[in-house]
């Protein structure tokens, strides 16, 4: 059974549930720090799942072999168990999973935060390999990448801006876990999204201090879905954990209100 953190309840004002999908090396805990309570307090039912092999969600096979299709299946499982289709909100790899989910499933709306772009993670991997050639080579050879994050400096570089206190970076770094090697292949070439198949309205948010995906890539993601990206200039990749997380949550809330959700 998938780990699911479920807070708040649907209200007359907000009858549509929200389903949050985490990124690589993370789990449902990253949404439970701030976002779930924020949206529950604003009258929504807010749920975050841990994808299989993450957090408290078991996996029937080694995590290195889990695919993007497996993660999409997890989202389908949770979404179909809700009384009405949820808004799907994905961060980083979770944004990629949301894009794939929306190719074949209808949703009232979707939100992409610092998401893997539709063209995949090829440029990201090249940038990272140039920055850390030996750790990345080791990850590719062994299928294990968690060792890359043993340095708090790298955790901050990839996920957090300088505004995040060091104690918080260390606390979150301790919660990171292994990620699937198969997903790197899927998100590089094998299973790229098809934006033309998606009809769901999307809000695309990017971070100006993102150590994973560039502002240019955030704008390219938005263009692929016929919208414009909104950039939070001083934020790092983990927009839901950064000191300015509330401004991101408030923007999502106001946008959903404008969509009648």
Question: Which role fits each region the language model picked out?
Answer:
Residues 23-27, 92, 208:
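Active-site glycine-rich loops that stabilize anionic/oxyanionic intermediates
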Residues 24-36:
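The serine-hydrolase catalytic nucleophile loop
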Residues 38-60:
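Conserved alpha/beta-hydrolase
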Residues 56-86:
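Active-site loop/oxyanion-hole signature of alpha/beta-hydrolase fold enzymes
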Residues 107-142, 183-187:
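Flexible "cap/lid" loop of the alpha/beta hydrolase fold
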Residues 198, 204-206:
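Short beta-strand/loop motif that positions the catalytic acidic residue
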Residues 211-220:
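Conserved alpha/beta-hydrolase "acid-adjacent" motif
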Residues 228-261:
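Catalytic active-site module of serine/aspartate enzymes centered on a nucleophile-bearing elbow/loop
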